[in-house]
Design a protein with these regions (language model features):
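Charged low-complexity interaction tracts in eukaryotic proteins
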Residues: 2-11, 38-84
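Positively charged, polyanion-binding regions of nucleic-acid-associated proteins
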Residues: 2-29
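Amphipathic coiled-coil/heptad-repeat helices and related helical stalk/stem segments
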Residues: 11, 98-99, 151, 179
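Anion (oxyanion) recognition and catalysis
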Residues: 20, 107, 187
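A short acidic, leucine-rich amphipathic alpha-helix
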Residues: 30-35
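Nuclease catalytic cores
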Residues: 49, 78-117
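Active-site metal-binding core of divalent-cation-utilizing nuclease and nuclease-like domains
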Residues: 85-91, 107, 115-162
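Catalytic cores of nucleic-acid endonucleases
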Residues: 133, 139-153, 159-225
Length: 226
């Protein structure tokens, strides 16, 4: 879109038109990458885009950081296999969405990434998670007994020596204690541990992590909200 066309459109219209060109949906990061801000008289265009997607009646939120056009709602939800009344379909999409974000962040930090076999064909936007994950098979960084635990963790980041630096478990409705038990088994590695969940589960996390059995890892496990 040329600058003359941009001058005739409001900022909201420009955001909507950009989302159309992206297929009717986009992450906030993607919008900021492809938007032409040359005619915007603001020093903080990214903040303006955030305000627009949050307030526009023409745009709806699929997940935090992921937005779509109301005019394309049915098409987009079918594309992502989301049935709004089906809690399970929403959970499956959300789980893969946050796994995909974690894989992308790992790449930005120049780390290698892994997702477990059972999740590799789940969709992150228009790609399967396997396309974002560096390792199809988890690196053999320890004994088989511990690898069996590690290979079920939702996302792992590895350094250049193929040693794990970060373990992430994405929790929607499953028992957080199960994830903490995995981290407990993996505590001897020089790694950080994270539970990624809705903020409404933070009290549950605090209750579980304060159990005496998890005292050796309490200071190393962090809770991250969506």
């Amino acid at each position: 879109m040329n600058n003359n066309a941009n001058l005739k459109m409001t900022q909201e219209q420009q955001v909507i038109e950009t989302m159309r060109r992206q297929g009717g949906y986009a992450t906030l990061r993607r919008l900021n990458e492809v938007m032409d801000f040359s005619t915007w008289k603001t020093k903080t265009p990214e903040a303006s885009v955030r305000r627009i997607v949050q307030n526009s009646n023409a745009i709806f939120r699929i997940q935090p950081g992921l937005w779509a056009l109301e005019e394309s709602r049915d098409i987009i939800l079918r594309k992502f296999k989301i049935q709004e009344e089906d809690v399970r379909s929403v959970e499956l999409f959300s789980h893969a969405y946050y796994q995909g974000l974690l894989l992308e962040i790992g790449h930005y930090r120049n780390l290698s990434t892994y997702v477990p076999p059972q999740d590799r064909h789940h969709l992150f936007l228009d790609k399967e998670l396997r396309e974002l994950s560096d390792y199809e098979i988890i690196p053999q960084f320890t004994f088989d007994t511990l690898l069996r635990k590690a290979r079920t963790v939702d996302v792992i980041w590895f350094n250049e020596r193929k040693m794990p630096t970060h373990f992430y478990e994405v929790e929607h409705t499953t028992d957080i204690k199960n994830s903490l038990s995995k981290f407990y088994e993996l505590q001897d590695f020089y790694s950080s541990f994270y539970i990624v969940a809705n903020e409404c589960r933070e009290n549950e996390f605090n209750d579980k992590i304060n159990a005496s059995i998890f005292s050796p890892i309490k200071s190393r496990v962090k809770f991250i909200t969506y």
